[in-house]
Amino acid sequence: MEVKSLNEQTDKTKVIILTANHRIKGNISLYSNVRLTDYIVEARPFIAVTDAEVMDINGNLIFNASFLNVQKDHIEIIVPADMIADNTAR
């Protein structure tokens, strides 16, 4: 992935992130025309997530945050929320 200008357009993408102990719903900022897979491969050690809802693995809400960082090495699954068939994931 090439280095992008700070002036380049980004889009908020709602994602679901699963770690060993947490389920996180929130937004990440992707540059236009960049796939989520490419973003994750090229990302720094932490992924910025906005408007985050953090739940335990059983679905119990732990907290909400306007911003948090997720350590990339702890991500087991990440998927755009609009690709989930189950409407409860959105």
List each model region and its residues.
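Conserved RNA-binding domains used in RNP assembly and mRNA/RNA metabolism
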Residues: 1-90
